[in-house]
Amino acid sequence: MLNKVRANQIVAKALQTRKKFLNVGANVPICPYNLAESMGFDIRFVNIPTFEGMYLADDGVILISADRPEGRKRFTCAHEIGHHILGHGTVIDEIIETGSDKKIEKEADFFAGMLLMPSSAVLRVSKDLGVDFDLLEPQEAYMLSKYFGLSFTAFLTQLYFNLKLISWATYKNLKPIKLQNIKASMSPIKASGQIFVVGDWWRERAIDIEVGDFIIADNDCDFEGPQILNQLSSLDVQIYEAISPGISKLSNDHWGAYIRISRKNYSGMYQFRHEEEVE
């Protein structure tokens, strides 16, 4: 664990970084890729086994494993930004499922969590959704994890260890739950990919998904733009499956959000991840 003084310093740096490069406050989520791009980094997704990510200090490059889950990739990007802001120099991050004991890795992880999930943003959206953290349900935690672009486990870790918004009992009860069971309880169809439940509470950010993921929205929403989603039938809600890379929009009379679909396990430069693959 970081000492309180150092933790406060890192929180301040994370919030300052958001404000300086994206001009946003602590009450909205951010896309770490957009932030890295605004900071002048080249972001590349690469296929390297046992590799999580790398920050190349002298070259202004962030490398991210193309083979990891999307939530993990976004956290890795924020983690590598942390290495830069905290002055750690060039760092290679290998896959360590239980976390690293190295001080610089703990600092970069803490920075990433506070960059992506400031307490003000979590409290705002939980209020919009009517979420009570003392009674947090698995489906609510899953929905919020997708909103902040984190894995289910990373979201719970941030809630308990860093933000102190849930109890140990809640953390312990939610963490072992299998994602396929949560998804089955949320969708009338079997979803192999991730599920994004969206609505008027989903504000200030695009819906970033991969081919094979699903969006659940209210029945009164309209879809605009290229046909990159396949609408599936349901009695109560609209369900869309992402079938092709591209950018479009989902909206109704009082809400709207852009949808950005990337190729599954895309490798290459970040700015091309939403483009069709050339044969």
Give a label for each model feature.
Residues M1-E279:
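Active-site hotspot residues in diverse enzymes, especially metal/ion-binding acidic/histidine motifs
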